[in-house]
Amino acid sequence: MLKSVLTLVAMLSTFTASANTTYTLQASYEHKTQDSYEYQALKLALDKTTADYGPYKLKVTDEPVPPSRFIIEANAQSKENFIFVDSVNKEYVEQLSHANFPVLLGIIGYRIPLVSSDLKSRGYTISSREELMTYSMIQGKGWLDTDILKDNGFKVHTGKYIEGLFHMVAAERGNFFPIGASQITTAIQNFKHVEGLSIDDKILLYYPLPRFYFMGNKNIGKMARVEYGLKLAYEDGSLQKLWQQHFLQAIASVNMEQRKLFKFNNKYIRNIDRSYEQYIYNPFKNN
């Protein structure tokens, strides 16, 4: 059934797609873009749809576009068919076109806290939501996560600079600094010069934080191709294989399935098509 629906979408969208379509992906800040999961997943989706949509070119922006300019650049078309990955929010959905598929299979929504080594050594017990709410959080100023945590009733301490957030939690200027489960081991390694950092080993926070591919609002047909390709890749297992190559080692090291899970709401995705939820990774599925 899924394959027949996706094939129909592809056939309808093919009429609006041009031959040898160019996609220009947002450059990575941290490493070579071509080595990133976001680049490789997009390439996989485009490869899967070549038979229906024709050849393509996948380029990368010369420099990373600041997130504050994503909407402007996408709709201005100054960069040929600019495409980027980011967490879903109301502004993106209203002003851009998107592929309704969680590119990272929702792993960023699972958050594991960094804590101070002193707090961890003193010990703490969190067995209920009420107990968890007595602890304060640390997040970046202006981050979507900050708003989500505040909306759910947490006291949140904010900082402007990334490194400063690690110093804040180490100095207990807040209790927990939740980071994406797939990112936390890399974060600890990158900021190992900050003394007094530890990874909590008790809890796992979750709020839906899907990351979609976005393009300008006139690129609905091109986005349909990407969504179709991602779903084909998921259906045949090739996307999960790629995802595991990039993230499985990192998430295995933090024992997600052994933690106590606390779920929270994200009101900023209230009006999007929830069919993406079937593709969200569940670390407790086999428990």
Residue ranges and their predicted role:
Residues T14-S18:
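N-terminal signal peptide c-region/cleavage motif recognized by signal peptidases
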